[in-house]
A protein has these predicted regions:
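Bacterial Sec-dependent N-terminal signal peptides
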Residues: 13-38, 111-125
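Structural motif
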Residues: 155-158, 197-198, 235-242, 281-288, ...
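Repeated scaffold domains used in trafficking and secretory/extracellular systems
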Residues: 133-140, 174-181, 214-224, 255-271, ...
Length: 456
């Protein structure tokens, strides 16, 4: 609050103004008033009040100048008798107002004396797409430029094209646990507990549902119309290989080589092989399986046994020549065994709490970037760090961090912001946008999942 005292020195014919104090000598006090220094609009405020008090000995005549189209005032002029006050309502029109904090001024004239009030406005625009579902698993087809994810509530496949904000869906009969998209982006297979569902992403329909003798923690759709199901349970188990060309007696597995339950699998770019990252065992390793004859047959594992951390998951480079592991180790891969799964560097993903794991990774060769979701520490479940970390895909050096839009929850006062916890990140085919699937961390919202589209 500022108090303005304007007075006349009778010895000379000039005027003076001072805030919160009076000059000496004081002979004839004429105009004295008080107004706030500033008016600050929170995200939820649209109307605030300014009180103008006449604390002098004569009436005050005033007018207000406002040139900002986003600011409206209830009156632009008035008169205040001695000892009285006037209230003026200031309103904010947030249409076309950009996101963030902006400032403007209202200019006052009190009995020909100028003054001003700073107007501050905090504006929040919901730029992310709030989902009407949760997110269990997700993949992105750069061939079709579309994001595909499965949800439990409701049980469905969800499809979002890169240039659209409309999500198309395919209802499912069983609770989904994982999804794999075909390399051509035409079809996908969804894993369940005891079943898998083969879907057509073009017609948004179910092709067929098949029985499977396990709970699917991960699944891979081959180019041969086989589905490879990785079991969640039983420490030593087998990859269930489902020949979807057959309606019955279509489950096979390699009787010789077992895997550890919880293994995560992905098919390489050639479509001939699947790599699998073991979980629940130390040291964790990566196995290679040949699927050219349908059934997945283990042919060998990496030459390292505890030399480098793999930590149970991995992602391919776009050209299919490298693997980036959850433990930040980078490996070269090849169809030649002596050149396959060979150490090729480490991503120095240092976080404030120490060296964390990579929880998700996407590679854009056009940008020469790796987009990482990182966790802090080594505890389970992992604490995901809000933000997308960008690394150079050639030298593996850190470049920058992209901040994520928080979730805003209104309350009776100013509202609360919750961090956006990232789960999946994908770059589109042209490397112009990132799609980040986030969850409102600790908010407990009915709709706590969202997709953020970020220009890159």
């Amino acid at each position: 609050m500022k108090k303005i005292i304007c007075f006349v020195i009778l010895i000379i014919t000039s005027f003076g103004c001072e805030k919160d104090s009076m000059n000496e000598p004081q002979i004839d006090q004429t105009t004295q008033y008080s107004i706030p220094d500033s008016l600050n609009f929170s995200i939820l405020d649209n109307n605030l009040k300014i009180t103008i008090k006449n604390e002098g000995k004569i009436a005050i005549h005033y007018n207000v100048e406002n040139s900002n189209k986003h600011i409206k005032i209830s009156s632009s002029a008035g008169e205040i008798a001695v000892g009285n006050q006037n209230d003026m309502i200031v309103s904010i029109n947030r249409d076309d107002l950009s996101k963030g904090k902006f400032y403007s001024k209202l200019y006052f004239n009190f009995n020909n004396k100028k003054d001003s009030i700073v107007i501050g406005v905090d504006n929040f625009i919901e730029q992310k797409v709030i989902l009407n579902s949760d997110v269990i698993d997700a993949e992105y087809s750069k061939v079709k430029d579309q994001l595909v994810f499965v949800s439990e509530h409701p049980m469905q496949v969800n499809i979002l094209k890169s240039g659209s904000e409309t999500i198309q869906t395919i209802p499912l009969l069983y609770t989904p646990t994982c999804i794999s998209i075909s390399q051509d982006g035409e079809t996908a297979v969804v894993g369940h507990d005891g079943h898998i569902t083969y879907v057509n992403l073009n017609t948004k329909s179910i092709i067929k549902t098949y029985n499977v003798s396990c709970f699917a923690i991960d699944i891979v759709l081959g180019n041969n119309k086989w589905a490879y199901v990785f079991p969640k349970e039983n420490q030593s188990t087998y990859i269930r290989c489902i020949n979807m060309n057959l309606s019955t007696e279509n489950e096979n597995h390699d009787n010789v080589n077992q895997i550890y339950a919880g293994t995560k699998g992905k098919m390489d770019l050639s479509g001939k092989f699947i790599y699998g990252a073991a979980n629940g065992v130390s040291p964790a390793d990566i196995d290679k399986f040949d699927i050219q004859n349908g059934t997945a047959v283990k042919i060998y594992d990496s030459p390292y046994h505890g030399d480098y951390p793999f930590n149970g998951d991995f992602w391919f480079s776009e050209d299919g020549n490298r693997i980036f592991t959850r433990g930040r180790t980078v490996l070269r891969i090849s169809e030649t065994k002596s050149q396959d799964l060979i150490y090729n560097g480490t991503i120095n993903a240092t976080v404030p709490e120490g060296h964390g794991n990579i929880e998700w990774l996407d590679h854009s060769s056009k940008k020469n970037n790796l987009y990482l979701i990182l966790s802090s520490g080594y505890y389970w479940p992992p604490t995901r760090i809000s933000g997308i970390f960008i690394y150079d895909s050639t030298n593996l050096n850190f470049k920058s961090k992209l901040e994520l839009e928080k979730f805003f929850v209104p309350n009776n006062e100013n509202g609360v912001f919750y961090d956006a916890e990232p789960y999946f990140v994908f770059s589109n085919a042209e490397a112009t946008s990132l799609f980040v699937i986030t969850k409102a961390k600790g908010a407990g919202l009915a709709k706590e999942w969202a997709i953020q589209k970020i220009a890159i």
